[in-house]
Amino acid sequence: RKGDTRTNWMLKNQTELLDGTIYDLIFIGQDLAGNQTGFITTPDITYDITLPVFAILDPVNEAFVNYLTVSYEISEPLREGTITWTALNPVKDPESPRIISINREEMIEGVYTDVLLANMTNLIDSVTYNLEMKGADLATNEGIPSKVTSVHYDFSPPIITLTHPANNTYQAKTFLNYELSEDLLYGQVSWLQLYTRGVTPDTVILQGNELLAGLHDTTMFTAIVKLKDGASYDLIFDAYDLAKNEAVTGRISNVTYDFTPPEIELQYPATLAAVNNTNLSYFISEFLLEATATWTWVDGVLDMDDHIHPLEPFEREPGEKQFIMLTNAPDLVDGAYYDVTIYGNDRAGNPSNLATAKNVKYDVTSPVITITNPGPDVFITSTQTAYDLSED
């Protein structure tokens, strides 16, 4: 009718159009007097009733990532599109949800790999987000949203703290004390032998609980290597977290592993000997970090004192010591019997044997000999004598 306007009108005799086909729309009309309108044409109309398909390819569900880029695929050009990051814990990200509009050049049909969206904002470190991609094609058909859940964004490297062994120390055990600020995807510890050319480092790959965050005390690794007795090493700890952030390398320098206990041989005094001095002769196989010489009363004249005397550094040097008087010599009781013992630990803490001489008599009193027969000023007919001894 005159003056009528038809909006979104479906013609009664409309035929089925083919999806994805481009048409020209031609309108021909005639009034009641038979006057024709002529051709009214709207060219190049694309008939599209198929929903656009889009998918987030990366990151994937429950991924740990250290980047803001996304990879996605679009089946046809879009008129509008967004990707939304929603924090699972919105308290940690007050700006959540972060709705990022996709630019026109980012909405062309195809696959997009590692794209940093033009409108992308920074995300909060160590926060987990859900991602959702929405969009509508040029015909305003809205696609089914593509969702990715529980993506953990981690931009910080893990922190490795090494607490044992210390630099420049001797160790009798190969365990390691370390602390991790977060779970690791990969970690390795290498022992690099020092002062030796052409030696390949001995490396252990961390496994299972060894990769978990927290304190790891006296850890003997599952795949521990056999280190060389007496050799010195640098320890190198390399790792990266679940998002593949690389840690600053942890390093412990110049650790010498010593698995052999020191040997001490007490040469003087000997068991059951009688001596008039406190001198000692002994042999030590290696330098001792600490050592003592002990005289323990066992018999004879009573001695109530303890005689435990530390050896000075030069007295702990390896090799033989001949008849030396210790700097810290004991004050023994004349006529007493002692067990004499030297004992010590090497720089790695390995204990020595107990080098002992038993029942050693300490005697600084000169013996007294009394002749009872013959007496003075007498004539004798034989050479027989009689005498008394004050001691053996």
Task: Annotate each language-model stretch with its function.
Residues 1, 94-109, 199-213, 304-318:
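Solvent-exposed serine/threonine-rich low-complexity stretches and specific carbohydrate-binding patches
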Residues 2-21, 32, 106-126, 138-139, ...:
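Signal that preferentially marks extracellular ectodomain short beta-strand elements
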Residues 27-29, 133-135, 237-239, 342-344:
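Conserved structural position at the C-terminal beta-strand
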Residues 31, 41-52, 137, 147-161, ...:
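Flexible, low-complexity linkers/stalks enriched in Thr/Pro that connect modular domains
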Residues 36-38, 142-144, 246-248, 351-353:
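A structural signal for beta-strand boundary/capping segments at domain termini and interdomain linkers
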Residues 56-60, 162-166, 266-270, 371-375:
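Surface-exposed, proline-enriched loop/turn segments that connect beta strands in immunoglobulin-like
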Residues 61-66, 167-172, 270-276, 376-381:
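Short, solvent-exposed loop/linker segments at the N-terminal edge
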Residues 74-96, 180-201, 284-305, 389-392:
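Solvent-exposed loop/turn segments flanking beta-strands in beta-repeat/beta-sandwich domains
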